[in-house]
Amino acid sequence: VERVLVTGSSGHLGEALVRTLTGDGVPVVGLDRRPSPWTAVVASLTDRDALRSALRGVTHVLHTATLHKPHVGSHSRQDFVDTNVSGTLAVLEESAAAGVRGVVFTSSTSAFGRALTPAPSGPATWIDETVVPRVRNVYGATKTAAEDLCELAALDPGLPVVVLRTSRFFPEADDRDDVRAAHDDTTLKLVEFCHRRVDVADVVSAHLAAARRAPELGFARYVVSAPSPFRRSDLAELGSDPAAVLERRAPALAALLAERGRPVPPVDRVYCPDRAVAELGWTRS
């Protein structure tokens, strides 16, 4: 990795990537619509002139810029298409024209949509790369559309692209009112690390590993999440008695929650990042 363009450099992940690359002595250009100390180019993704200028001399692109799930209530579907689909197309086309060696596209486990949600009172779902997405909202729909454009760019004109479907890494509180009312934020995040959350530092290392491997992979897609103590054999019990499974698989965490008098939140899914670890050589903290 010789020179990197990070889109969305004013965001949580984009800033972390720019900080890490800069600290490692890698030349990096940050591009975002919002100014920040980590953003050198303030421009929209669809500003092709600004994008071409930012791509001069760039060998790898880390494309994190996006409208997120919390924006569903404040932005139109067209806004999502403009940023997440048209913006990604612009990044892919201009990257190919600039001779970029590899692009890493930050997708989301939200792309799985309704496939994430088990039947009422049913077992938790096991989520890996074999699960077929079922659309739930415009965020997931535009992420899967952008992923398709990434695969198309890998086929023609042959731009190496790695898609990372990342689980939760944002510091904000859960966006579901009923969940926030039933559980405190610390408890939610601690348990989520067992099945649907990842540290932002590990998301950074996954992007850097993907950038290094992109030229030889051509196109690939991975789930990126923290290692889970849960197993496939736990899924039925996770759906009915997550506290019992937590006590068995993560006894220290179960004891901490019991000591604090905190109930164990529901566990409806388990993300499996094994393929990313095996194929990217991704190491996690």
Question: Whereabouts are the PLM-identified features?
Answer:
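Catalytic helix-loop patch of NAD(P)-dependent Rossmann-fold dehydrogenases
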Residues: 82, 118-160, 189
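Mid/C-terminal beta-alpha module of Rossmann-like enzyme folds, strongest
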Residues: 204-267, 273, 278
